[in-house]
Amino acid sequence: MQVTVEKKEGIHCSLLIEVPANEVDSIVTKEINKTAKTIKMDGFRPGKVPAGMVEKKYGEQIRMEVISDLIPQKYSKAIQDEKLAVAGIEVELKENKKGEPLKFVANLELFPEFEVTGFEKIEVQKPVVELTDKEVKQMIENLRKQLATFSEVERAVQKDDKVVIDFVGKRDGEVFEGGSANDQELVIGSGQMIPGFEDGIIGMNKDEQRTITVTFPEDYQNKDLAGKEATFDITVKKIQEAQLPEVDDEFVAKFGVKGGVDTFEDEIKENMQRELKFILQRKVKDQVFKGLREIAEFETPKALIKREIDAAKQNLVKQMGGGQNFDVNQLPDNLFEANAKQKVETSLILDSIIESQKFQAEDAEVESLLDELVQAYEEPEKTKEQIKKNDREISNLKGLVIENKLTDWVLSQAQVTEKQEDFFEVIKENMQAQQAGF
């Protein structure tokens, strides 16, 4: 086999591969003879079909099957011999004739080689959240609201009421798509609608009609509406008042608390502290990773981005309960491209730093992280044993330990400032980020 490496711009190169004719033809001949022993053909007994007739009728098909198997073997050997780190490959068949060498080109996209420097340029705003009894009591109040029952009342709408409304949204006097609904249930103050919408309903009475003006957020998912002003014609059809349950043993049992009311507040606080810790870690990590992407300079392999896009499509279809008959190719790549590129770049950067700094996860560190994570479960020890039997879960935990070490290492060199934040705002932002798929 003859291999010529042709370097191209950036992370691209080509392998011009030539396989001797006698090697290819020998394999094809063997396959033809093997086929002749098993194929059925009119006028011949099984196993007695002449190889020449098999070649005449099926020779091209057999040759293409041989070539399809041979090409990956040959370019894999060439890649190994040349010690190339390949991210993606496309093959062009150049010559494929009996009695002549097989010639093809393997166009390669390589993993980029780069070094990350300039960590001192990264800016991170570290959120600081004070968790007091006030926040704990507010959380318990929120839990009561989750289990609230509602009864109809004859008065004006107040905060925390559940209303049934019809509404029609308009831009410049024209009804816009997706901006209207009938018999929509809405809890006032839930934040379900865009800012200003729910406040605009407060004070309305049953059967009253009102037109309100609101502005869509700049980051609204529909870019045609983002930052734009709109009006909504609203009709209130029903007003219901919330009745909150008492905080008693029956109430706390619904949230898996076994110690009754006496331990409820302590458990709620522990859960809040645990959730807050992981959310704040995630917020800091996201800033660190964003900063790393900004300082790192390299070309991102398109093959890796495409692979990530395909995986995101499959995950979305699975989450939405899509069946096997759904063609994921119907989903346009551009919906997933930005996130896919971000994920690939982050992964390449982290791998580069981990290799250069030789970060590792010690067994004791993995065990400590596992102990912390399982506290969120009803049966921590049982959950811990189940996870320890799952190699994939343990591998993920090791990755998380290393990721945490890397983050701390970058933070030690970055420009870090602190910012006071509200617990419930942090939780809300985290939920919005998860819903947006980030």
UniProtKB/Swiss-Prot annotation:
Gene Ontology MF terms: peptidyl-prolyl cis-trans isomerase activity; protein folding chaperone; ribosome binding
Catalytic activity: [protein]-peptidylproline (omega=180) = [protein]-peptidylproline (omega=0)
PROSITE patterns named among the record's database cross-references: FKBP_PPIASE (PS50059)
Domain PPIase FKBP-type: 160-245
Function: Involved in protein export. Acts as a chaperone by maintaining the newly synthesized protein in an open conformation. Functions as a peptidyl-prolyl cis-trans isomerase.
Domains: entry comment: Consists of 3 domains; the N-terminus binds the ribosome, the middle domain has PPIase activity, while the C-terminus has intrinsic chaperone activity on its own.
Protein name, UniProt field: Trigger factor
